[in-house]
């Protein structure tokens, strides 16, 4: 089939203020000269250095935690465990979780008091006069675990008898889409194509690790300057610190890379707790190793696409199953899963659709927002499936790939989620 491109008619644009003109970024000068202040650049007088003690096993019960040697080390201002916290659950009340209600078993803990669920779970906080002293104090913390079986594969985590990461069944979120009649749609197809795809964990590796400072001002307000993408977390942080919201002020600094990884609470709560306990300014900056161990990743997905297609390359039906690996805690998994579900069929008209998606807790690092927020998982698969269908149809009908591509083009239509494309 021959296709000749037609020239587009000339378009006269109105005079625009920005489009088509050079724009000077307001932050360009500071970044080019190195004068921009990031969270890790802030040092305060009389400041303590904070460190976090993390779990070294993926799943187990804390049998004994002894921080007495760390507390006795000269230069250590305080050591905090879950026993000293007013409440240890960092509530993440996310809509979209199973039953549309928060499942407490999937909430993250500020500090693990009895159970650890992944390598990197925070157990204790240390504040000391110097960074070296704080690191030495971490080495003096003694912990004994009763190790439990761990589960890393979300499909295994769904099986009866699997290790329980999130009670009662490891499911932290479900979504579904129903449109038309799937059986009738498949019966209309000349060919049914089924494929299973996997999307792996992805690490952001942003240049700036998690960092911030906290202090108490003359009004008795806890101030936190932090590299964050969401300052609105102050409500949850105030709850964790057991102080009124008007006693907490969070100021975001320039973010040296976030990509969704700094949408969650990172070290804000740790800073607030250490500052309240010591009544002194505290600074925390993760090392690269700590950052990679402690922050979230992009969700791994297992996606099975089963689609029916006619010889004219019209999709008659689509059955899609998605399993997302939530890791140890829920965080933004319900929202990420929602967007992946809503875009599961891509930009194609499909009149008969069944989509089932589930996010599953495992003993992996927790997963959360990453650029695209679930949509890339669905999009990359949606663009792989047409290629699979074309290959199958070309083999059966002796069409070229180009011909089958043109046959699949359509004008404006309504997507299964009632959006107009």
Identify the residue ranges that each predicted region occupies.
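Gly/Pro-rich active-site capping loops and adjacent beta-alpha segments
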Residues: 6-16, 133-155, 175, 232, ...
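Helix-loop-helix junctions that connect adjacent transmembrane helices in secondary transporters/permeases
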Residues: 159-241, 384, 392
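Flexible, low-hydrophobicity surface segments
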Residues: 1-171, 192-195, 277
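Conserved catalytic cysteine-centered active-site region
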Residues: 113-115, 244-252, 276-287, 291-294
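General beta-strand structural signal in soluble alpha/beta enzymes
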Residues: 34, 78-82, 118, 193-195, ...
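Short Pro/Gly-enriched beta-strand edge/turn motifs at strand-loop
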Residues: 96-98, 187-202, 284-291, 333
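Flexible hinge/switch segments at interdomain interfaces of large molecular machines
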Residues: 39-48, 207-210, 352-365
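Alpha-helical support elements that line or immediately flank enzyme active sites
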Residues: 52-86, 123-144, 211-278, 332-346, ...
